[in-house]
Swiss-Prot record:
WD repeats lie at residues 32-125, 126-175, 176-223, 225-270, 271-314, 315-371, 372-404. GO terms for cellular component: CAF-1 complex; chromosome, telomeric region; ESC/E(Z) complex; nucleus; NuRD complex. Binds directly to histone H4, probably via helix 1 of the histone fold, a region that is not accessible when histone H4 is in chromatin. Probably forms a large corepressor complex that contains ncor1, sin3a, hdac1-A and/or hdac1-B, hdac2, rbbp4-A and/or rbbp4-B and possibly rbbp7. It comes from Xenopus laevis. The lineage of its organism: Eukaryota, Metazoa, Chordata, Craniata, Vertebrata. Belongs to the WD repeat RBAP46/RBAP48/MSI1 family. It is found in: Nucleus; Chromosome, Telomere. This is Histone-binding protein RBBP4-A. Keywords: Acetylation, Cell cycle, Chromatin regulator, Chromosome, DNA replication, Nucleus, Repeat, Repressor, Telomere, Transcription, Transcription regulation, WD repeat. Its main location: nucleus.
Length: 425
C-alpha cells in the first residue's frame, strides 16, 4: 500500500515539476538575457568556470571554459573540461527566438556548437568535486568515492582518455579514511589544499613541496574538531592562514593554521538547526561569510562577532548544498540545492518595504529565482569574466548557462516589479 502511495506521490510531483518547467520556459524571454541548456552525457556533480577567456577577432562571441566531472552508472568516469561560447554584449540578440527543441535563446548566428567537451581524463569513480588551483589553473584537484584526493595537471594528459581506462593522476593525496565533497585551494599560498571528509576530519596538503618522483603525498596537517561528517571547507580569501569548515554537527568552525592545536578551532559556532552543507567567504569584505544548511536557510556571519547571526535568508523549500558570493558585486550571493532552485540574494535589499503581493513571492532580498532545473542542483559557479553569468548543473544531466535580465539587477525603474520566478501571483 505504501509503495502505491509513494508511486502516486512521485507521479504527482513529476506532473507539478513539468508544469512549473513549462511556465518557466514560457517566461524565459522576460526573465533572462541568456539561457543555454545542454544535456551532458552523464550528470556532473561539480561545476567551476576556469579563469581564462578567449575573444576571437571579428566574432560576436567569447570562449570560456568549465571544469566538470561525470557520475556514471557503472561506466568509466572522467574529469571533463568543456568550452562554452558566450555572446558579446553587442551580439545581435533576439529574445523572441527561442528554439524549444534545443531549449536555447539569446542565440547568435546558429545556436549549435556553443558547448563542447574539449578534454576528458580518466577518473576513478565519480567526480564528487573538482577545483582548479588559482595560481596554476592547469592543476585540478578532485574528490573521489574513495578516501584519496587526486591531483591532475591536464596539460600532461591526452585530450582523449586512455582506452585502457586507467586513472593516472599526477598526485594522490592521502590522509582521509572516507570520501567527501569539500575542497579548497589557498588563493594566497600556492599548492596549499584543504579537503573535508565524511571521516569527520579536514586534511591539509602542500603540494608545492612534493619531490618530483613522489606520486603519493601524505597530509601535512589533519584537523579533528568536528564530531560528524565535514561537508565543506574554504580558505579565507585574504588571510593565508585562516579557513572555515562546516559539518553535520551543525557547527561552523574557523581555524588558523598557525595554531598548534589541530583539534580545537579558534572559533566554533552553532550555526544552524540542522546539518551545515556549504560556506563561502565574501571576496570584497574580509569579515563576512555565508553558510547554507539542511535547515533550508542561508546564514550571514561577521567574523568579528560570530555569536550573533547577522541575517537568515529564507525562501528555499529544501536542503541547501551550495552557496557562492558573486565575484563582481559585494552584496550579491547565490544558493542552490534539493528544491531545484537557484536563488540569487541581494544583501542591500534586506529590510526594504514591500507590498503584501511582493511579500508573497519572497523577502525583499530575494532578487531572483532560477527555475530552469527539474532535478536537484548539484553545483553552480559564477563566471569570473562575465558579470551575472552562472553555470548550474543538476542530477538529471542538465547543465544551464544563464544570465538574468539586466532590468532585474539594474533596478532604476522600480515600477512594475516582476515575480522573480515569473509564475504570476
Amino acid at each position: 500500500m505504501a509503495d502505491k502511495e509513494a508511486a502516486f506521490d512521485d507521479a504527482v510531483e513529476e506532473r507539478v515539476i513539468n508544469e512549473e518547467y513549462k511556465i518557466w520556459k514560457k517566461n524565459t524571454p522576460f526573465l533572462y538575457d541568456l539561457v543555454m541548456t545542454h544535456a551532458l552525457e552523464w550528470p556532473s556533480l561539480t561545476a567551476q568556470w576556469l579563469s581564462d577567456v578567449t575573444r576571437p577577432d571579428g566574432k560576436d562571441f567569447s570562449i570560456h571554459r568549465l571544469v566538470l566531472g561525470t557520475h556514471t552508472s557503472d561506466e568509466q568516469n572522467h574529469l571533463v573540461i568543456a568550452s562554452v561560447q558566450l555572446p558579446n554584449d553587442d551580439a545581435q540578440f533576439d529574445a523572441s527566438h527561442y528554439d524549444s527543441e534545443k531549449g536555447e535563446f539569446g542565440g547568435f548566428g546558429s545556436v549549435s556548437g556553443k558547448i563542447e567537451i574539449e578534454i576528458k581524463i580518466t577518473h576513478d569513480g565519480e567526480v564528487n568535486r573538482a577545483r582548479y588551483m588559482p595560481q596554476n589553473p592547469c592543476i585540478i584537484a578532485t574528490k573521489t568515492p574513495t578516501s584519496d584526493v587526486l591531483v591532475f595537471d591536464y596539460t600532461k594528459h591526452p585530450s582523449k582518455p586512455d582506452p585502457s581506462g586507467e586513472c593516472n593522476p599526477n598526485l594522490r593525496l592521502r590522509g582521509h579514511q572516507k570520501e567527501g565533497y569539500g575542497l579548497s585551494w589557498n588563493p594566497n599560498l600556492s599548492g596549499n589544499l584543504l579537503s573535508a571528509s565524511d571521516d569527520h576530519t579536514i586534511c591539509l596538503w602542500d603540494i608545492s613541496a612534493v619531490p618530483k618522483e613522489g606520486k603519493v603525498v601524505d597530509a601535512k596537517t589533519i584537523f579533528t574538531g568536528h564530531t560528524a561528517v565535514v561537508e565543506d571547507v574554504s580558505w579565507h580569501l585574504l588571510h593565508e592562514s585562516l579557513f572555515g569548515s562546516v559539518a553535520d554537527d551543525q557547527k561552523l568552525m574557523i581555524w588558523d593554521t598557525r595554531s598548534n592545536n589541530t583539534s580545537k578551532p579558534s572559533h566554533s559556532v552553532d550555526a544552524h538547526t540542522a546539518e551545515v552543507n556549504c560556506l563561502s567567504f565574501n571576496p570584497y569584505s574580509e569579515f563576512i561569510l555565508a553558510t547554507g544548511s539542511a535547515d533550508k536557510t542561508v546564514a550571514l556571519w561577521d567574523l568579528r562577532n560570530l555569536k550573533l547571526k547577522l541575517h537568515s535568508f529564507e525562501s528555499h523549500k529544501d536542503e541547501i548544498f551550495q552557496v557562492q558570493w558573486s565575484p563582481h558585486n559585494e552584496t550579491i550571493l547565490a544558493s542552490s540545492g534539493t528544491d531545484r532552485r537557484l536563488n540569487v540574494w541581494d544583501l542591500s535589499k534586506i529590510g526594504e518595504e514591500q507590498s503584501p503581493e511582493d511579500a508573497e513571492d519572497g523577502p525583499p532580498e530575494l532578487l531572483f529565482i532560477h527555475g530552469g532545473h527539474t532535478a536537484k542542483i548539484s553545483d553552480f559557479s559564477w563566471n569570473p569574466n562575465e558579470p551575472w553569468v552562472i553555470c548550474s548543473v543538476s542530477e538529471d544531466n542538465i547543465m544551464q548557462v544563464w544570465q538574468m535580465a539586466e532590468n532585474i539587477y539594474n533596478d532604476e525603474d522600480t515600477e512594475g516589479g516582476v515575480d522573480p520566478e515569473g509564475q504570476g501571483s
